[in-house]
Amino acid sequence: MGDASDAGLPVKRRVGPDGIHLFDRRTGLNVLFDEVDVPETQWTRAPRQVSIALTNACDLACPFCYAPKAAAMLDADRLCAWADELNAEGCLGIGFGGGEPTLYRRLPQVCRHVAEHTSLAVTMTTHAHRFTPRLIDALAGAVNFVRVSVDGVGPIYEELRGRPFVELVQRLTWIGRAFRFGLNCVVNLRTLPDLDAVSDLAATTGAEELLLLPERPARGRPGSSPNVVAALHQWITDYRGPVALTLGAGDSGSLPIAQPLPSETGLRTYAHIDASGTLRRSSYHSTGEPVDERGVLAALERLQQKDVA
Ligand code: SF4
């Protein structure tokens, strides 16, 4: 279990049904002592990872966006308090998203608080177009991993994201000099033919990871068809590139994927807090529990009980 005394240390310890798990936020190294049988009463209470939508605001208009469009933004002091609580309860990392997290004015201050007062890894999902040398300086050392949304190259990228591809490549070069980073790719009929080019882009820019995200149904769009998902799985099977591939939970189908912590499931693994402060099982779930003055863990327990009832 994590505790307040480990604040600021890079290596985090977490215990659960799979054993004792050590995590180093600087390198992303995970070590699991699975021969240790830990009684359930000692299991870590917090989810392993929590994503937080800082704001619903975004300056792009991607056709497949499922982020809520109602104006909402989290208070920075609440965010810091939640990070402290999650850290003390054994969470390993928080991922800031949105909307677009770089539109959140106090992003550098919140990231620095987490870096200096907790052992949580900070990740961020961004379209990257607001990464300037100044913002990079403000975030350097306070963000452990940056996930950049890239669903195609050249004209397909520009059609979907509405920004010059050459500017994206410039931002990736800057980001790669300051942070470990990966690419997130929404896969649908339009982007599927660009997967080779996106994986080449990941390799040439120094990305460590390519996260493949079959498009989810949202706002009248049906999401990726079974044929697209089957073609994606075939592409993954044939892939021989140097960049590690990852898939979102529930997207692996019959693919043989590594499951290092098979017994840690559901809310033990992951939870999402939206920009209005509601804790949900994921950003795709429409219902949840508000995080009030009792904190994140109290909301988590209410959500668990609600699901049991
Ligand atoms: S960049 Fe992300 S949040 Fe913004 S419109 Fe596109 S998908 Fe939505």
Protein language model features and the residues they cover:
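N-terminal pre-core extensions flanking Radical SAM catalytic domains
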Residues: M1-K69, A258-D274, T278, S282-Y284, ...
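Conserved alpha-helical substructure of the radical SAM core
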Residues: R13-R14, D24, L29-T126, R130-D137, ...
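Short, intrinsically disordered/low-complexity patches at protein termini
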Residues: T44, H127-A128, G206-A207, R219, ...
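Short, well-ordered coil/turn segments that N-cap beta-strands
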Residues: R48, G90-L92, T118-V122, A142-N144, ...
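Juxtamembrane/interface motifs at transmembrane-helix termini
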Residues: L86, R190, L300-R302
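Radical SAM enzyme [4Fe-4S]-AdoMet core and its adjacent flexible, acidic
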Residues: S149, P155-R280, Y284-R294
